[in-house]
């Protein structure tokens, strides 16, 4: 929720509580409720007027049957926190809007939507995801990928390597992708090849957008583009088929892309927020880890400082 609206919304919540009115929304997103509140003994939760939490789980290319998997996580968290927790599935734009409109309290978000959630809803990241194929534990690389037989070679400096791309065709993931557009374009600007994202055609002969990691990489495999830019973890299934891995190679990499994380709205009281964070961290335990891995192939959640974690994205956006 936006800070300036707290007073008005607080009064509205009071009125709605007295009148017994319940507002439901987010109709474009599937909803499931995991209710284990009968195990909760802490009356202070009710005193703070927090009767349930809503978590948005954005759909991703490597997530299948996400609603059921999210339901299982919500059920686990509900037991740990002691109040009903709703699992909602939708895209990241809908997740940010739900936080802004006070229809959600928590969301799994990548770094750029996390910044948007901070701007619109005063939400902050408290946890980041760790994957086995992240180079920096909770940061990863943006990679320029070329055909294995390409004449383009990695040089002794980023500038020398990227200079070879002049006049070539490039396929970005999408204009909103951090590793597949924002970070690589920022690098091109820093190296002096283009002034901004609107002048990419002055350096490349053709600029394409794959729409997702798989399609961008497929363009490389099929010889339809000279280079594509994706996340390093996209070089593994399900994004890139195992039989195609030896058909491509990394030309250049940019480190420090912030891993996806978990944003919590500022309206969630500190005591509830900490209970939720501690419950989420219990997903790291061996007996619970499969619940976490099933969502997005993450192996661990770690605490992060919101500003420090997202600073690389802030800096990259300045150049783009």
Specify the residue positions occupied by each region the protein language model found:
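A ligand-binding cleft/hinge motif common to bilobed small-molecule-binding domains
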Residues: 111-122, 184-190, 218-246
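A conserved helix-loop-strand patch within extracytoplasmic ligand-binding domains
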Residues: 130-181, 186-187, 191
């Amino acid at each position: 929720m936006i800070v300036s609206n707290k007073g008005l919304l607080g009064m509205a919540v009071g009125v709605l509580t007295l009148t017994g009115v319940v507002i439901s929304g987010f109709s474009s997103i599937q909803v499931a409720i995991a209710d284990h509140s009968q195990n909760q003994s802490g009356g202070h939760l009710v005193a703070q007027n927090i009767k349930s939490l809503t978590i948005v789980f954005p759909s991703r290319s490597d997530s299948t049957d996400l609603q059921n998997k999210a339901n299982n996580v919500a059920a686990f968290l509900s037991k740990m926190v002691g109040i009903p927790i709703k699992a909602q599935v939708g895209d990241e734009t809908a997740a940010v809007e739900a936080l802004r409109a006070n229809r959600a309290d928590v969301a799994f978000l990548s770094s750029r939507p996390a910044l948007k959630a901070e701007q619109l809803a005063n939400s902050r990241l408290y946890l980041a995801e760790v994957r086995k194929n992240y180079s920096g534990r909770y940061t990863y690389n943006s990679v320029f990928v070329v055909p294995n037989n390409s004449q383009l070679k990695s040089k002794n400096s980023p500038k020398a390597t990227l200079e070879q791309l002049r006049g070539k065709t490039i396929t970005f993931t999408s204009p909103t992708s951090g590793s597949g557009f924002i970070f690589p374009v920022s690098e091109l600007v820093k190296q002096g090849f283009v002034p901004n994202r609107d002048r990419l055609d002055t350096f490349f002969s053709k600029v394409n957008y794959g729409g997702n990691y798989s399609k961008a990489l497929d363009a490389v495999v099929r010889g339809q583009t000279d280079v594509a830019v994706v996340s390093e973890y996209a070089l593994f299934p399900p994004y890139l088929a195992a039989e195609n891995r030896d058909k491509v190679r990394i030309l250049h990499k940019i480190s420090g892309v912030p891993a996806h994380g978990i944003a919590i709205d500022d309206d969630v009281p500190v005591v509830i927020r900490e209970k939720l964070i501690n419950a989420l961290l219990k997903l790291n335990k061996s007996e619970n880890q499969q619940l976490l891995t099933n969502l997005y192939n993450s192996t661990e959640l770690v605490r992060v400082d919101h500003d420090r974690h997202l600073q690389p994205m802030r800096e990259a956006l300045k150049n783009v």
